Amino acid sequence: MAHAMENSWTISKEYHIDEEVGFALPNPQENLPDFYNDWMFIAKHLPDLIESGQLRERVEKLNMLSIDHLTDHKSQRLARLVLGCITMAYVWGKGHGDVRKVLPRNIAVPYCQLSKKLELPPILVYADCVLANWKKKDPNKPLTYENMDVLFSFRDGDCSKGFFLVSLLVEIAAASAIKVIPTVFKAMQMQERDTLLKALLEIASCLEKALQVFHQIHDHVNPKAFFSVLRIYLSGWKGNPQLSDGLVYEGFWEDPKEFAGGSAGQSSVFQCFDVLLGIQQTAGGGHAAQFLQDMRRYMPPAHRNFLCSLESNPSVREFVLSKGDAGLREAYDACVKALVSLRSYHLQIVTKYILIPASQQPKENKTSEDPSKLEAKGTGGTDLMNFLKTVRSTTEKSLLKEG
């Protein structure tokens, strides 16, 4: 595999990383060829179809469509997003515990075929609902919350626009830091101390800005709506009591399959900076390490390859340690501290949007029928607080200077 940083010290196009939006899909396609109008109609009208109880019947009446008319990457990504949203809506219904355990063949077959082609599991992942689910309202204006919208949501008032777009804007803010990565490796190769120092401080600054963007979640996402509505539609069927064996993809696999729901663990951004800084999140074989390793299977293959390629580059941490240079150590630590701050903030968000609403549920609602059985779990199926605390702790332990 080619190194992420080839001799030109740019990030190779094969990794699908955009200069402006990073791991997000730049300018996603908004419409599929007319051949797929029936899919698009359902996806565009999910809130009405779910509310009226017609969604499942509409899905069951669909004709089986070939994926052969999806000829380019952007149309394939849009079709995956469309089929993923329809699948989540079909499985979880109105979100009150009436669950479907079999995905009809007319949707399961094209969805699985397309997923196989894109090397992603047939479930709605972060790369679908966040990275490919957006548009600019005015193409000539900047990428701000006010000038953006999502392509699809599940229910009216589910805060999906806020949740997906703020997540996307954090990704976009971090894209500025990704651009600096080639400079880091070039500076190490050329032994240019000042260039490396400046690059590390630039990465830290970009990650600090990403944290500021994260604050927007309070303006656009309501904890009750997230907990009781959106969270359910993002839940998967791995380790989920409601689909204890997984989901049957009729006509494609005979046995049910288990897949994790979409989660921030599927974002390549934070894994990318862990790898760059030599923070050993996936070492040690603990639950958190295993989960993060598993989540790579839920990332687009180009991004998985980028992470692998980064891992094969020389270690920034070892280089900084070998120099015995206080300035470099401080710059390295500034990057680590920025990641620690982001992870601490994520813990606060989980407390506000999951733990507190879970504790406020009326007792009669706390049944095993909660679709994501999630009291303290994330949509990816992890015990969320313990997982995030482990990840933050591993990050903190990577600081070169105590305190």
Swiss-Prot record:
The UniProt record lists the keyword Membrane: no
Listed cofactors: heme b
UniProt KW keywords: Cytoplasm, Dioxygenase, Heme, Immunity, Iron, Metal-binding, Oxidoreductase, Tryptophan catabolism
Superkingdom, taxonomy of origin: Eukaryota
Gene3D superfamilies attached to this UniProt entry: 1.20.58.480
Keyword Heme: yes
Pathway(s) annotated for this protein in UniProt: Amino-acid degradation; L-tryptophan degradation via kynurenine pathway; L-kynurenine from L-tryptophan: step 1/2
Any one GO biological process: positive regulation of T cell apoptotic process
Expression sites by tissue: Expressed in mature dendritic cells located in lymphoid organs (including lymph nodes, spleen, tonsils, Peyers's patches, the gut lamina propria, and the thymic medulla), in some epithelial cells of the female genital tract, as well as in endothelial cells of term placenta and in lung parenchyma. Weakly or not expressed in most normal tissues, but mostly inducible in most tissues. Expressed in more than 50% of tumors, either by tumoral, stromal, or endothelial cells (expression in tumor is associated with a worse clinical outcome). Not overexpressed in tumor-draining lymph nodes.
Binding annotation for heme b: 346
UniProt EC number: 1.13.11.52
Cofactor note: Binds 1 heme group per subunit. In the active form, the heme iron is in its ferrous state Fe(+2). The catalytic cycle does not alter the oxidation state of the heme, but IDO1 is prone to autoxidation.
A cellular-component GO term for this protein: stereocilium bundle
Compositional bias segments (type: Basic and acidic residues): 363-376
Pfam families for this protein: IDO (PF01231)
GO molecular function annotation: electron transfer activity; heme binding; indoleamine 2,3-dioxygenase activity; metal ion binding; tryptophan 2,3-dioxygenase activity
Subcellular location: Cytoplasm, Cytosol
Activity modulation: Activity is inhibited by and MTH-trp (methylthiohydantoin-DL-tryptophan), modestly inhibited by L-1MT (1-methyl-L-tryptophan) but not D-1MT (1-methyl-D-tryptophan).
PROSITE patterns for this protein: IDO_1, IDO_2
Subunit structure: Monomer.
Stated role: Catalyzes the first and rate limiting step of the catabolism of the essential amino acid tryptophan along the kynurenine pathway. Involved in the peripheral immune tolerance, contributing to maintain homeostasis by preventing autoimmunity or immunopathology that would result from uncontrolled and overreacting immune responses. Tryptophan shortage inhibits T lymphocytes division and accumulation of tryptophan catabolites induces T-cell apoptosis and differentiation of regulatory T-cells. Acts as a suppressor of anti-tumor immunity.
Protein known as: Indoleamine 2,3-dioxygenase 1
Organism of this sequence: Homo sapiens
